[in-house]
Amino acid sequence: MVGNIVTNPKLLEDTDKRYYRECYCGLCKSLQRKHKNISRFTLNYDMTFLIILLNEVYKEKNEKLECRCMMHPVHKHTYIKGTFIDYVADMNILLSYYNLLDDWQDDKNVFANCYAKLIKKSFKKVCKKYPKKAQNVQNALKELNDIETKNIINPDLAAQASGKLFGEIFAPYEDEYEEKLRDFGDALGKFIYILDACIDLEKDIKHKRFDRLKELVESQIAKNNSKYV
């Protein structure tokens, strides 16, 4: 359930584009510093959005730096360094690890399985640093998996579990902002789950996998047909 939150560059001012890129590059640098180069392949725009949100809510003052990297080896580019970038880098590892395991379970994706093993050490380090969050995320994913395993066709139940997961990630502290950030993450997580189901629908039908929308539609068709029997 990652890769759905992106920006539309055509609607951004130059200063906003620059800031977005600085947050994205800052996340990449934080992953490299905290979890080694291999972790940078987990980089995604969803987490960049979370950095921007938390920076705005907490009015975080970030340090702006310059560097070259393997993607930009010739010219230096700016990136930002700060508390929430490091927090989001850790959460990115947490979610990416579970997402890779999900890809392995659903598609038997060998690359996903191998990559999960490569970042497992970082995953354990994050779990040790944020035990409560790691446990809550695991609980939400277990709830989600149980719903899908039992073929429960009500998509709202699975969306609620997804909402719990995002709500946990979006609230870094137990403070005055926690409730609103958690509620925001919860609502966004529910939306993303349904969106993800729509995106995967054709593929799930082709491979005969469980899809909450496919099962719901088929159930409704069967129900309607029974009226005419």
Tell me the role of every PLM-derived stretch:
Residues M1-K164, E168-D183, K190, I194-V229:
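Acidic catalytic motifs of isoprenoid enzymes
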